[in-house]
A protein has these predicted regions:
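A short beta-loop-alpha structural element at the N-terminal edge
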Residues: 37-52
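A short gly/proline-enriched turn/hairpin at secondary-structure junctions
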Residues: 61-67
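A short, internal acetyl-CoA/4′-phosphopantetheine-binding micro-motif in the GNAT/acyltransferase core
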Residues: 122-133, 161
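Terminal substrate-recognition subdomain of acyl/acetyltransferases
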Residues: 1-37, 160, 166-245
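Conserved acetyl-CoA-binding loop-helix of GNAT-fold acetyltransferases
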Residues: 127, 133-148, 155, 169-173
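Acetyl-CoA-dependent GNAT
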Residues: 67-118, 124, 128
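Basic nucleic-acid-binding interfaces
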Residues: 108, 137, 176, 180
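Structured alpha-helical
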Residues: 98-100, 151, 170
């Protein structure tokens, strides 16, 4: 495991260097005390992972994510409705390749009367109870904001329960305008325009996340292979023992 941590740390340092060379602004790059969190761009082949993550949320976390008491059927229907071609969905995986936190950036395109396009986005996030307090929501929000800038979205809308203080704090810190309506609060953030630096940053962060995931996947497969070898050895030893008797 020490070797794996060394490989991941080396990969992180190289990615930091590439981000600096690309001139990525500080608001898109963690400071020296932060961990560069690998955030994967989820695809259709991750549907089972997404559903497993959402179903593992407790009742309170489901309430914070969806704004209502969602049962398993609601979650299943939500997962089926995901549009991977239109929207962007991100996930943070642990070493067992299970999603700890995920974000959904829904992209909306509206055609104005003058035939121009107006692009907006809506942000939703969920975090498993175990890693809470590690800043994963903030990291996911930064990643979503990066893509929203590159996708030429003008605004990001966040619907959050008024009791969801951490999410509202992140939105307020980013400069969003908050409007409370009873138990819900709507946060509207004007998105700065993207540029070459943000586009390069998105390419590098995606590559870092993909490489990190591949390392974790290889390690998991390697340990599974070792377990299989151990099982075979036990079977051979047991067979020899029976033959000797």
């Amino acid at each position: 495991m020490k070797l794996i941590r060394t490989l991941i740390h080396s990969l992180e340092m190289k990615c930091r260097k590439l981000l600096r060379l690309a001139g990525v602004p500080l608001d898109l790059e963690p400071n020296e005390h932060d961990v560069l969190v690998p955030i994967c761009h989820l695809r259709t082949y991750n549907v089972a992972d997404i559903q497993k993550h959402l179903l593992s949320l407790n009742a309170q976390d489901r309430y914070l994510r969806f704004g209502y008491a969602s049962n398993d059927e609601h979650i299943t229907n939500y997962v089926r409705s995901l549009n991977f071609e239109r929207d962007d969905i991100y996930g943070i995986f642990n070493r067992d390749l299970q999603i700890l936190a995920m974000a959904h950036l829904a992209i909306r395109t509206q055609i104005n009367v003058d035939s121009t396009q107006q692009i907006s986005a809506e942000f939703g996030v969920s975090v498993h109870a175990s890693p809470r307090g590690r800043g994963l929501v903030y990291q996911l929000f930064k990643r979503a904001l990066m893509h929203a800038r590159n996708a030429k979205a003008s605004t990001i809308l966040i619907h959050a329960l008024s009791e969801n203080a951490p999410m509202l704090k992140i939105a307020r810190k980013a400069g969003a305008t908050l409007k409370r309506d009873g138990s819900e609060t709507q946060a509207l953030l004007k998105v700065p325009k993207g540029n070459l630096r943000t586009r390069l940053a998105e390419i590098f962060t995606d590559q870092y996340a993909q490489t990190n995931y591949s390392i974790k996947e290889d390690v998991k497969n390697f340990w599974y292979f070792l377990m299989q070898v151990q099982e075979i050895r036990r079977g051979v030893q047991a067979g020899r023992h029976q033959s000797a008797e």
